Amino acid sequence: MITIKKGLDLPIAGKPEQVIHNGNAVKEVALLGEEYVGMRPSMKVREGDVVKKGQVLFEDKKNPGIVFTAPASGTVTAINRGAKRVLQSVVIKVEGNEQITFTQYNEDELKKLTSDQVRQNLQSSGLWTALRTRPFSKVPASDAVPSSIFVNAMDTNPLSANPEIVLKEHWQDFTDGLTVLSRLHEGKLHLCKAGDSNIPTIDLPNLAVHDFSGPHPAGLSGTHIHFIDPVSVTKSVWYLNYQDVIAIGKLFTTGEIYTDRVVSLAGPQVKNPRLIRTQLGANLSHLTENELSAGENRVISGSVLSGNTAIGPYNYLGRYALQVSVIAEGREKEFLGWIMPGKNKFSITRTVLGHFSSKLFNFTSAVNGGHRAMVPIGAYERVVPLDIIPTLLLRDLASGDTDSAQALGCLELDEEDLALCTFVCPGKNEYGPMLRAALDKIEKEG
């Protein structure tokens, strides 16, 4: 077992009941273009077109053969674009249940699949987009070969669902998905799970099972990759989450794409925090209807630490999101707040009384201060368990020194890996966008 000692389990109120309930009816779904790093879409549909579930909506111009398919049947009601015509979202009003079917195999055939058969089915169905590379966190090229593949079957994000609860309903599909992934390449398939979980394993020649324990970010794929098979500019690995493995298993045994999602609907502003069954790309206004406390709320697709605000053309459940988190908008100002004892405030430092409390806090979107320079007081080192020097790395990201940042290990990271650094930063800096800018520059210029 790999035990993580550094990190932070955020003491946030609104933890979900670990029982799956049916969510509100899904009337509208969407694919969010900006989730796919570096993707340039070639549209295959127009507004007003009627599409089937599994039908191609757009293809990546930079990566021919990588298609993005409809998560439900219905009518394309909007294709939202932003500045410079960047694709924001393709919205579908859910109608009917027509769908496109793909190649189906029986369970005995799964262990005999060739890599080409696996690639063809994943790419034609759009499920290839469940895979992401490290470094750069992009959808892999159609002919790329990884050093290894990581399956994340644990989650230490605040307010997250327990994967074991979800997997109990789909164990056969999950093992089928692992079997399919083991046939995708000859390298290792790493299954990472919590040390105290009862997730059974399957006997596959190239499957390695790893147990992790400790505070967040022990459950992030970036942490797993760092300790098991670190990447470099010349070495790439792929990773995906456990619910996408279930979907892959169902695709190969039924010939149909599976877009159901079990997500945690939780946070201080949720009336009844729990796990709900919904659909990939679901409209979050519909999903949270009559579920939230009164007032101005911020709905987040994903974790409170690294998720995206669900608003306007982005008001949908993200492709990789397994959570819907809701906090209050913190717009009120506190006079001389820095001098008060702060028994109802949380800090990783011993500057407020809340640091010594075991209570859960009603966090809001307020950052409790204005932007200022980095202050190296050891806060970053407390929450980063990786074998890197976080203060120096963050300094290089802030200054745009990509050569030094690369030498210090930025290629191993994704935005979610620096989310805790953003949370504890005394200077209120957002390190995720800085990291993405550095990765884009490194990929472009080398």
From Swiss-Prot:
Q: What class of enzyme is it?
A: translocase
Gene Ontology MF annotations: oxidoreductase activity, acting on NAD(P)H, quinone or similar compound as acceptor
Q: Which Pfam families match?
A: NQRA_2nd (PF24836), NQRA_N (PF05896), NQRA_SLBB (PF11973)
First and last residue of the signal peptide = none
Looking up Gene3D superfamilies in the UniProt record yields: 2.40.50.100
Which reaction is this enzyme known to catalyze?
a ubiquinone + n Na(+)(in) + NADH + H(+) = a ubiquinol + n Na(+)(out) + NAD(+)
A GO BP entry is: sodium ion transport
What the entry lists under InterPro entries is as follows: NqrA, NQRA_2nd, NqrA_C_domain, NQRA_N
Question: EC number(s)?
Answer: 7.2.1.1
Keywords of this entry? Ion transport, NAD, Sodium, Sodium transport, Translocase, Transport, Ubiquinone
Give the protein's biological function.
Answer: NQR complex catalyzes the reduction of ubiquinone-1 to ubiquinol by two successive reactions, coupled with the transport of Na(+) ions from the cytoplasm to the periplasm. NqrA to NqrE are probably involved in the second step, the conversion of ubisemiquinone to ubiquinol.
Give the record's subunit note: Composed of six subunits; NqrA, NqrB, NqrC, NqrD, NqrE and NqrF.
Q: Which PANTHER family does the annotation name?
A: NA(+)-TRANSLOCATING NADH-QUINONE REDUCTASE SUBUNIT A
The record's comment on protein family reads: Belongs to the NqrA family.
Q: Which HAMAP family match?
A: NqrA
- Please give the name of this protein: Na(+)-translocating NADH-quinone reductase subunit A
Name the source organism: Histophilus somni (strain 129Pt) (Haemophilus somnus)
Q: Which gene encodes it?
A: nqrA
